[in-house]
Amino acid sequence: MTNEEKGCVRSTKNLRVCVSGGHCDGKDPAYVEECYKMGAKIAKMGFRLDYGFSNSGVMGAVARGVLDNWRERQDKYYGDVTPIVGVTTREYYELYEKDEVLQQISEVVVEDTLENRKIKLLEADIVVFAPGGVGTLDELAYDCVAMQDGFLKTKPFIIYNVNGFFYHILEYLKVLAASGFASPVPFIVVDDSEERETAFRLLRMRYNNCADAREAYANARQLAYELPYFLKKKTDSSVHVEDIWAEMKEIEASGGEEQKQALASEIEQAYLEKEIERMYDRLAKTGRDTAIVSDKLTRLKQRKKKWK
């Protein structure tokens, strides 16, 4: 079996990031602004963008972010490799064929059906869901089913929860899992550009150290739990993510039992604090009952007493 058949990730250079999002701007200007920044960061980190070949809305913003920032890094990261792969169908391609922005995308894959388009996009290493409409929701549902049923190589899914956009969907997915209709999907939820960049950096390091795609997925599951710890450490000490990672790996590999327990407690505390912060934010935006938040807060207080 070849490395490609195993889903092995050989190098972090030019990791492919698939972004799914809306072809409209949405009512909140932050959707387009944040997704343009995401495109810029994809280029600056030397990643490649796989997306649905659109020049408008959220998707157009991501593409412009990449195109506006990749040339200054062409020699270092890209060489002759195009920074964007547009994946579309014949009908959609003909709508945009003469578009000034899209003509800058030198690699375009034209599939026969929307189904094949989705399958092609899922060849990326990382999948990001940005604010969008029913098309984005369709791709999110399709990707979850494909991965859980074994038709898709396991890989990290990032939810870019700009201004709480995905709160309702995340709650619905939790209800499905709790009701026994679906397995929980370990989405890496990021709320802003700092969290998104931290997740990208950690995934890049994890890909560099994993043997195959299944291990990358397991790492992503763990990252969903550990991410708040990295964010908190960055805020408290202004150190680089890579240094925090190295310190964590050192403790896990050769630290004493007390050090390991202290690290585990810090990670758990940061995770619970982030969950509570996110739940209060969700309540403010959706008006949901506070019972769940109260329960989480009680658990956190109990654990803090134990840690002391």
Regions found by a protein language model. Name each.
Residues K232-V241, S254-K260, L283-S294:
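Charged, low-complexity interaction regions
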Residues E4-V85:
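Glycine-rich beta-alpha loop segments
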Residues L203-D236, E242-E247, Q261:
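C-terminal amphipathic helix plus adjacent low-complexity
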Residues S56-R64, F165-A177:
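Glycine-rich, charge-decorated loop segments at or immediately adjacent to ligand/cofactor-binding or catalytic sites
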Residues S179-N219:
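A charged, well-structured terminal subsegment
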Residues F53-P131, G135-T136:
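Acidic/glycine-enriched connector segments
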Residues Y77-G79, P83-T88, A130-P131, E139, ...:
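Short, acidic/small-residue loops that bind anionic groups at enzyme active sites
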Residues S265-Y280, K296:
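Short amphipathic alpha-helical heptad-repeat segments
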